[in-house]
């Protein structure tokens, strides 16, 4: 990243020097006094346009088009991952699809719920998610697979700009293998766990009640049960609460999963979320362990892999998506030691 940025800056400075030399010492008749002000402004604008035309300063930029037809057919850079006051109005077909995900009966009015929600939590996109003009944002998406055990990936994971985790994943006691840093943690009410003070909670709402739960959990604590008991109160700073856009869930389902499963898992939602906000993405803790077992790294689960047979998510198809992304050099997958 630094080498590529340095190359751009060197090119820019060299261009200024050569232009200045030509204007001051040739017989063009252009006054040298004109150069410092007007020419610098034009050069600065041209350089800004040049940099803006580059997806990033990484060696491989995820959003670079015309690298893979398969990727270009699925990736829509105009899709906004987070719900805000500016994009909260959903198309009717998207809204009806979302309501069917968990067959919610008599849902509250979504518009009223969103208005109440954004009186409590930020209504604008997390400024950290806005990509810089020049740079390379490296992100680690840490899954919950048992293949993280004894991997010693911890320091490598922590070296990324963003570290995304999901659901009930703990770090305390597992730092050597999974790292200790978390910048964004994706959860839904039934999978919530206490988060660190500076961690951004990204709520993935599968029903209107999930949005109401955020309101309740940060105020009155009246919602204690959905289809299972949920925490009545949470210790998360309101400015650290972000909402995954329901329309983005449908985008993942339509464009990436092409209708496989009932709806996307938190894992694939985290991955597609990351390729929209990051320039480089590394996956850790996805897939089975070396013995072919599917279980969480923090537990010895006698029924490992049972979740793959529920029919809610198509785990095999989702895993094929991740391996294809890796095969075309859009992401990297670290499968454990």
Swiss-Prot record:
Q: Which GO terms describe its cellular component?
A: extracellular region; Golgi medial cisterna membrane; Golgi trans cisterna membrane; trans-Golgi network membrane
The reaction(s) catalysed by this protein are: a beta-D-galactosyl-(1->3)-N-acetyl-alpha-D-galactosaminyl derivative + CMP-N-acetyl-beta-neuraminate = an N-acetyl-alpha-neuraminyl-(2->3)-beta-D-galactosyl-(1->3)-N-acetyl-alpha-D-galactosaminyl derivative + CMP + H(+); a ganglioside GM1 (d18:1(4E)) + CMP-N-acetyl-beta-neuraminate = a ganglioside GD1a (d18:1(4E)) + CMP + H(+); ganglioside GM1 (d18:1(4E)/18:0) + CMP-N-acetyl-beta-neuraminate = ganglioside GD1a (18:1(4E)/18:0) + CMP + H(+); a ganglioside GA1 + CMP-N-acetyl-beta-neuraminate = a ganglioside GM1b + CMP + H(+)
What EC number(s) does its UniProt record assign? 2.4.3.4, 2.4.3.2
Annotated localization: Golgi apparatus, Golgi stack membrane; Golgi apparatus, trans-Golgi network membrane; Secreted
- List the molecular function annotations (GO) for this entry: beta-D-galactosyl-(1->3)-N-acetyl-beta-D-galactosaminide alpha-2,3- sialyltransferase; beta-galactoside (CMP) alpha-2,3-sialyltransferase activity
What tissues is it present in?
A: Highly expressed in submaxillary gland and to a much lesser extent in liver, lung, kidney, heart and brain.
Activity versus pH: the note is: Optimum pH is 6.4.
Where would you find the membrane-spanning parts of this chain?
A: 5-25
Q: How does it sit in the membrane?
A: Single-pass type II membrane protein
Q: What is this protein called?
A: CMP-N-acetylneuraminate-beta-galactosamide-alpha-2,3-sialyltransferase 1
Give the species: Mus musculus
Q: What is the lineage of its organism?
A: Eukaryota, Metazoa, Chordata, Craniata, Vertebrata
């Amino acid at each position: 990243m630094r080498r590529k940025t340095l190359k751009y800056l060197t090119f820019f400075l060299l261009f200024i020097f050569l232009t200045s030399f030509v204007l001051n010492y040739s017989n063009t008749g252009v006054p040298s006094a004109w150069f410092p002000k007007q020419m610098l402004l034009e050069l600065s604008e041209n350089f800004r346009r040049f940099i803006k035309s580059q997806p990033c300063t990484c060696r491989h930029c995820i959003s670079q088009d015309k690298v893979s037809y398969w990727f270009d057919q699925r990736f829509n850079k105009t899709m906004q991952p987070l719900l805000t006051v500016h994009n909260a109005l959903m198309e009717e077909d998207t809204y009806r699809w979302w309501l069917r995900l968990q067959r919610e009966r008599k849902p509250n009015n979504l518009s009223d719920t969103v208005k109440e929600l954004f009186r409590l939590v930020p209504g604008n996109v997390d400024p950290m998610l806005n990509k810089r003009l020049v740079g390379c944002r490296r992100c680690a998406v840490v899954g919950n697979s048992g293949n993280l055990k004894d991997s010693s990936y911890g320091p490598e994971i922590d070296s990324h700009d963003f570290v995304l985790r999901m659901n009930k994943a703990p770090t305390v006691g597992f730092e050597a293998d999974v790292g200790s840093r978390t910048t964004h943690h994706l959860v839904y009410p039934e999978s919530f766990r206490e988060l660190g003070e500076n961690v951004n909670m990204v709520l993935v709402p599968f029903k209107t009640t999930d949005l109401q739960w955020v309101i309740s959990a940060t105020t009155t604590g009246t919602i204690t049960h959905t289809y299972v008991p949920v925490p009545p109160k949470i210790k998360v700073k309101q400015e650290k609460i972000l909402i995954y856009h329901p329309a983005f869930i449908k985008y993942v389902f339509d464009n990436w999963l092409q209708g496989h499963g009932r709806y996307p898992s938190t894992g694939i939602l985290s991955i597609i979320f990351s390729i929209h906000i990051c320039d480089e993405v590394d996956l850790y803790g996805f897939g089975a362990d070396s013995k072919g077992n599917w279980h969480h790294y923090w537990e010895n689960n006698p029924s490992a892999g049972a979740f793959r047979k529920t029919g809610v998510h198509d785990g095999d198809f989702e895993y094929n998506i991740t391996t294809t992304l890796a095969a075309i050099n859009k992401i990297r997958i670290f499968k454990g030691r």
